[in-house]
């Protein structure tokens, strides 16, 4: 008898040690989640707030998402940490109801916002011509307000008797008593979970299908040279044929890489949603159907832990994955080393980026946008990427979704500079690649910066001309006031000489340098 009692005591002590170790592990994990969620969402909110040009309609949804997650990490997760240590609620009934309502509200709004982001990108890809008119900044704000009201409708019933809030020691927090009202559980799952899930599956599925189609024509952000042009340039030359064959192989590899990266990005978005919220929905549905004790405590703890990790994943996927947001964040954090490397160009063109992004959001074609910002000089047919997460391609009727750049920056510069192909880059990327030692470029950039105010008066006419070009094939002269940037200040003499020399060549007249200088002097006197 004494031996059996001693064995039982040893087993109980061992179980106690295991339970204590598990409690410590759970507490440490939730502390790490709380810190990462707070920091991650805070940096995205601050970056978007301090850089207003980043608040495009698409990024307004990201701002709402990260703001709600930041609110959750500050007002709720610290109490979850305390409850995970004590295995009890110590903050009263009122605060229990408040944290339960806050958790349910933020969770519902986050899932619905993810569905809204999917719909926004769906319209950006499939309907690029009407996207800027349909998805405006004001409508994005209205959609966000509706999302919060929609979530509030789904979260208030427990306060009025349809189910209730209670502390669940295995979920570490106060939450809905899912097992008490099957009808409310079914209502909340349908109202706040299934709707965004269906929207994401449909929208991202169509986006990936369009990306596969566009990957056959667009690679590395460049317009693919047509087969006729390639054959005309290779008139029976053996070396040229060999080069063309190798180039075609590289294109095929790039196409496969583009599709793979698009698939990986969509897989990450959907996979994160299903991994963080899927198990939680399954567990609460099981509790509602089979009772409270139908799910083991370890599973309850695990699904709660996964649901909290969504607050860490959202700023990473929808914030830091964005190249522009990431660059601005690095510029804010490492001001001395990162931001001052090209301080003059970045400082003088910060407003240029803001204006150019707004012009791109108006839905104008890339060549017109480039002409507006470049002072009337066409940058060539190609593509232009806006902050809405998609790229305009003039050779295509639809746009390719850029959830993330299909190729890395290194491969972009390597492939897009070969054979003088016209690359598809943003205006910020164009400025980043300008040689820092060229004073003329800085001067021209400053001229553009000073003359941007004159664009507003003629912008409507420019949009009208662009619409005629796109829809009717007509081209009318763009107002000259748009191009006054070239005449505001005198550009360097050698640039004027190059311009005059090119004009004379086009007219069939060859002039020497002395004639060019004399003509330039006459223009200055006039």
UniProtKB/Swiss-Prot annotation:
Membrane-side (Cytoplasmic) residue stretches: 49-60, 120-139, 208-263, 322-526
Knockout-associated phenotype: Embryos exhibit perturb cardiac looping as the result of a defect in left/right patterning.
Cystine residue pairs: 96-174
Keyword entries, A-Z: Cell membrane, Cell projection, Cilium, Developmental protein, Disulfide bond, G-protein coupled receptor, Glycoprotein, Membrane, Receptor, Transducer, Transmembrane, Transmembrane helix
Gene3D superfamilies with a match to the protein in the record: Rhodopsin 7-helix transmembrane proteins (1.20.1070.10)
Domain of life: Eukaryota
Bilayer-crossing regions: 28-48, 61-81, 99-119, 140-160, 187-207, 264-284, 301-321
Compartments, record wording: Cell projection, Cilium membrane; Cell membrane
SUPFAM superfamilies: Family A G protein-coupled receptor-like
Residues annotated as glycosylated: 2, 6, 12, 97
Stated family: Belongs to the G-protein coupled receptor 1 family.
Protein name in the entry: G-protein coupled receptor 161
Name of encoding gene: gpr161
């Amino acid at each position: 008898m004494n031996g059996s009692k001693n064995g039982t005591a040893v087993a109980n002590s061992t179980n106690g040690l295991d339970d204590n170790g598990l409690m410590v592990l759970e507490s440490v994990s939730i502390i790490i989640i709380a810190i990462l969620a707070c920091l991650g969402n805070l940096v995205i909110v601050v970056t978007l707030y301090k850089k207003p040009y980043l608040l495009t309609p698409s990024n307004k949804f990201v701002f709402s998402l990260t703001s709600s997650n930041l609110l959750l990490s500050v007002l709720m997760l610290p109490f979850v940490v305390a409850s995970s240590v004590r295995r009890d609620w110590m903050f009263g009934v009122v605060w229990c109801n408040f944290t339960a309502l806050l958790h349910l509200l933020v969770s519902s709004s986050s899932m619905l916002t993810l569905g809204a982001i999917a719909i926004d990108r769906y319209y950006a890809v499939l309907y690029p011509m009407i996207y800027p008119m349909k998805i405006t900044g004001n409508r994005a704000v209205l959609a966000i307000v509706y999302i919060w009201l929609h979530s509030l409708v789904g979260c208030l019933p427990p306060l009025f008797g349809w189910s209730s809030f209670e502390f669940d020691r295995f979920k570490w927090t106060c939450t809905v008593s899912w097992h008490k009202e099957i009808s409310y559980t079914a209502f909340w799952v349908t109202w706040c979970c299934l709707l965004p899930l269906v929207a994401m599956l449909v929208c991202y599925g169509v986006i990936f299908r369009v990306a596969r189609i566009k990957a056959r024509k667009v690679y590395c952000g460049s317009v693919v040279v047509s087969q006729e042009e390639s054959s005309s340039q290779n008139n029976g030359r053996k070396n040229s044929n060999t080069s063309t064959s190798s180039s075609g192989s590289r294109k095929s590899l790039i196409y496969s890489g583009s599709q793979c990266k698009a698939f990986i990005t969509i897989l990450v978005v959907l996979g994160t949603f299903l991994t963080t919220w899927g198990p939680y929905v399954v567990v609460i549905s099981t509790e509602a159907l089979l009772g409270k004790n139908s799910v083991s405590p370890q599973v309850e703890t695990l699904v709660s832990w996964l649901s909290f990790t969504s607050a860490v994943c959202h700023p990473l996927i929808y914030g830091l994955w964005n190249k522009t947001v990431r660059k601005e964040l690095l510029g804010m954090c490492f001001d001395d080393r990162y931001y001052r490397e090209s301080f003059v160009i970045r400082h003088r063109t910060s407003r240029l980026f803001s204006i150019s992004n707004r012009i791109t959001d108006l839905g104008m074609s890339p060549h017109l946008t480039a002409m507006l910002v470049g002072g009337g000089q066409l940058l060539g047919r190609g593509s232009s990427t806006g902050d809405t997460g998609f790229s305009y391609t003039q050779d295509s009727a639809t746009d390719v979704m850029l959830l993330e750049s299909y190729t890395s920056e290194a491969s972009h510069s390597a492939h897009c500079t070969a054979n003088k192909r016209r690359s598809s880059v943003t205006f910020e990327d164009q400025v980043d690649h300008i040689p820092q030692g060229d004073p003329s470029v800085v001067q021209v950039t400053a001229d553009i910066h000073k003359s941007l105010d004159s664009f507003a008066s003629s912008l409507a006419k420019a949009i009208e001309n662009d619409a005629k070009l796109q829809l009717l094939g007509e081209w009318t002269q763009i107002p000259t006031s748009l191009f006054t940037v070239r005449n505001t200040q005198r550009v360097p003499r050698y640039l004027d000489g190059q311009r005059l020399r090119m004009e004379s060549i086009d007219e069939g007249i060859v002039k020497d340098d002395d004639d060019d200088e004399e003509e330039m002097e006459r223009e200055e006197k006039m």
